[in-house]
């Protein structure tokens, strides 16, 4: 996301579309949802490329990469449904936690979302190098929203080659 901020600052007066968006829209960025996992990645992969996905909550699975809760699996929507894409095993890489929003990080994101009336959301999923757009249930937004989601994601991906699509399209489950 650092490139997004930098582009906004450097191109504000040069890009009419960008200037319009900044002047007439609210944009919110949450650059890191998993600060403990982020710091742990820096420790285990100081040159970058760390792919530790869990926070650092003690789940009695040692002190390595099996420790913690996968925050992407700890949100409320169909959390743990059919055990697809997540696990109830605390030592699993995709452990979803004891219950939806059991982690302070996901609770904070939930509360932030509930306190804002978002019209659009683009999810930057750094673990898999994805830009995930609506919807997360396997369906697609109606036009022109689908095209808008894809155009925004493709413009961002032009700078880093990330995949753009829904969670179902990108990783095979939602």
What is each PLM-predicted segment?
Residues 18, 34, 67, 71:
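Glycine-rich, flexible loop/turn motifs
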Residues 10, 35-38, 77-80:
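Alpha-helix capping at helix-to-loop junctions
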Residues 47-174:
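Metallocarboxypeptidase
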Residues 6-9, 30, 110:
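Short, well-ordered alpha-helical packing segments
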Residues 1-5:
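Short, small-residue-biased leader/transition segments that mark boundaries at the very start
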Residues 6-23, 76:
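Flexible, small-residue-rich helix->loop connector segments that border functional cores
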Residues 40-42, 133-134:
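Short, well-ordered secondary-structure micro-motifs
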Residues 20-41:
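Short, conserved secondary-structure transition motifs
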